[in-house]
Amino acid sequence: MLMGQSVGEGSQLLLNSLFVIAALVFFAIVVQVSDNLMAIEAKRIGADKAGHHFGLVPRMHELFETKLPSYLKNERVISSKKGFDIPLEGEATKEKLEVSALRFAINPTNFRGISPIPKVLVEVGDSVKAGDPVFFDKARPELIFSAPVSGEIVEIRRGEKRAIHEIVILADKKQMYRSFDKPDLKTASREDLVTSLASSGLMTFFLQRPFNTAPDLDIIPRDIFISTFDSAPLAPDLAFALNGQDVAFQAGIDTLGKLTSGKVYLGLDGRGETDTSSVFTGVTGAEKVYFRGKHPIGNVGVQIHHVKPIAPSDKVWTINAQDVVMIGKFMLEGKVVQSRTLAITGAPLNKTGYVTLPIGVSVSDLLQSESVSENLRIISGDVLSGTQVTKDGFVGFYDDQVTVVEEGNQYELFGWLLPLDMRPSVSKTFPGTLLGGVPSAANTNNRG
């Protein structure tokens, strides 16, 4: 009798378990079908473009993710949990510095995809105006590289196999600009705009992906991407650099919109508690996407990957935010003003800040107030992707930052192993990670 009772209780328990399982499966199916139907409806009415999840229950990661600032509500936001920010000492203070520079250069080796020995149109002793052609690519004669300043050609530096490294210009005290006919953006065709921008040298500010080369003027890019912030160590604040340039930036965006068959994408900084500059947020004619995360989230290539990856047959163009302003000024004024606001950074410097100068400024002129010893390294760009230059060199064509760091001449026994000081650590094996990213003074040692 006891055995029969046990069998009956076991059967009842099994039936109850099967009932519970069936109920859970049924509930899961209902939730899944409802989620799918809500997602389809959200896509139909366009409500999914802000990147929100639509469903009966929140996803697991939504229960624990950081709450977004209020300005990001109803915006398309892409968040990345990967990456690493390297906090360094020597950030540029929000102050405009006055620097008097006389020597500038344009360097053909800064451009990928062109002949190492382009066709040079000037000689030592020639006078040029800002915007005059200096050289062009032999394979693509329509791709012209123009002078950033007016002045005298004082030197043409060559490297191995007579490859041209730098064409140096001694700038006039009063700048003279080559005059161009202003295209009418409302009536000009795409071909007219490309011809006008190419003749002025402004097409060289675009980079073509994949491979990050000088643009092919015979193709129409699928899309054009612009990152309005940089997440690299000690990177410049582009919102500060472009403060007050709303009109020129909008004119540049309008021009870019006619150069592509697709869209102009604007990558905005969504990492802060307050919105970025109105120079960027007030733009029309571009699709805005906010990005949150750690470096390299500000890299335009990372943004392309998240927004609309490049297919094998695709070609897209990218351009720096400051260069959009150059194009805008050209459309508004009919002259080429190749100037850029540089961030002067690095812990060894006595004074950091921002300076607005023509492209390709001499490093010795730029750092004339600093005592840069042999124990310091000068980098055109940031510490991760920049190029080492000497005081006799020039800032790179696409760079908007100069960084000075100590050479790693002090060697430590097992320096890569012993957690002796505060230093960044991806693996979180050093004590600096416990203090939430305390800035450290960088040097060139890899420490393993």
Model regions and ranges:
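Exposed loop/turn and edge beta-strand positions of beta-sandwich/beta-sheet ligand-binding modules
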Residues: P116, A147, A163
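Short, solvent-exposed loop/turn positions at domain surfaces
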Residues: P116-V122, A139-E142, K351
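N-terminal, Lys/Arg-enriched amphipathic/low-complexity engagement segments
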Residues: M38-L121, F291
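Short, well-structured beta-strand-loop connectors
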Residues: V122-F136, E155
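Buried, small/hydrophobic-residue-enriched core segments of structured protein domains
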Residues: L2-H52, L143, R157-G448
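Short coil-to-beta-strand transition motifs
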Residues: E142-S150
